[in-house]
């Protein structure tokens, strides 16, 4: 197994952990301030977009290396 491929797998796991932490923060914030849901939702979509961008860059690198 190539160590580069292992590093890319670890990066993808980091993306999953990052999304989980983001959603955890969103749920806690909405539980405290339910009236701010629309503002939190827009910020959540922006955060998920950046996190998923990292995942897709990692996916492209894995295809290039393979």
Curated annotation (Swiss-Prot):
InterPro entries: ATP_synth_F0_csu, ATP_synth_F0_csu_DDCD_BS, ATP_synth_F0_csu_sf, ATPase_proteolipid_c-like_dom, F/V-ATP_Csub_sf. One of its GO terms (biological process) is proton motive force-driven ATP synthesis. The chain crosses the membrane at residues 3-23, 45-65. F(1)F(0) ATP synthase produces ATP from ADP in the presence of a proton or sodium gradient. F-type ATPases consist of two structural domains, F(1) containing the extramembraneous catalytic core and F(0) containing the membrane proton channel, linked together by a central stalk and a peripheral stalk. During catalysis, ATP synthesis in the catalytic domain of F(1) is coupled via a rotary mechanism of the central stalk subunits to proton translocation. The keyword Chaperone does not apply. Inhibited by dicyclohexylcarbodiimide (DCDD); activity was higher at pH 5.7 than at pH 7.5. It holds the Pfam family ATP-synt_C. This is ATP synthase subunit c. The lineage of its organism: Bacteria, Bacillati, Bacillota, Bacilli, Lactobacillales. GO terms for molecular function: lipid binding; proton-transporting ATP synthase activity, rotational mechanism. The keyword Repressor does not apply. Its main location: membrane. The record marks 52 as: Reversibly protonated during proton transport. HAMAP family: ATP_synth_c_bact. F-type ATPases have 2 components, F(1) - the catalytic core - and F(0) - the membrane proton channel. F(1) has five subunits: alpha(3), beta(3), gamma(1), delta(1), epsilon(1). F(0) has three main subunits: a(1), b(2) and c(10-14). The alpha and beta chains form an alternating ring which encloses part of the gamma chain. F(1) is attached to F(0) by a central stalk formed by the gamma and epsilon chains, while a peripheral stalk is formed by the delta and b chains. PROSITE patterns: ATPASE_C (PS00605). CDD domains: ATP-synt_Fo_c (cd18121). It is found in: Cell membrane. Induction: Induced by a decrease in external pH from 7.5 to 5.7. One of its GO terms (cellular component) is plasma membrane. It is a multi-pass membrane protein. Belongs to the ATPase C chain family. It comes from Streptococcus pneumoniae (strain ATCC BAA-255 / R6). It comes from the Bacteria.
């Amino acid at each position: 197994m190539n160590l580069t491929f292992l590093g890319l797998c670890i990066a993808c796991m980091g993306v999953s952990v990052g999304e989980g932490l983001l959603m955890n923060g969103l749920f806690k914030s909405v539980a405290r301030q339910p009236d701010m849901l629309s503002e939190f939702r827009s910020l959540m979509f922006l955060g998920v977009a950046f996190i998923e961008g990292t995942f897709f860059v990692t996916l492209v690198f894995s295809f290039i290396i393979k």
